[in-house]
Amino acid sequence: MNIGVFCLENDSPHWLVWQKNLRQALKKGRIFGSEQIAMNITVYCDQMKVQILPTYCNWFLIENIKFDESKNTYVEPYLPHHKIGIIHLAGKKYDEYRFNKNKLLDVMSLNNNWIKKNIRFVK
């Protein structure tokens, strides 16, 4: 489970369980990924109830994304082409997009046209 996007009420019991698991994970000395490991333990081992959102709520496969020119938005590459809610620039391979806000992505549109688009939200 990727925790790039998640939400909890401030008084949710999940926070205390997650903090307990995070303290345990940090004792191992490896900081990177500890938050994610702790959340996975919280959900799958401690069996805290959650609602897992679909991938279009936290999309991180940029090379598989499509663009709907008629709606001017990124969409899933497969039917029914849900609108992508959040594009998660996770991992070193996306550093060029994370550090250069003007970097354009070559993306295939639903009309099978290659177009250049900014991966970032632009009003």
Where are these regions (language model features)?
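Substrate-binding/active-site groove segments that recognize
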Residues: 6
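A glycosyltransferase accessory/donor-loop signature
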Residues: 2, 10-123
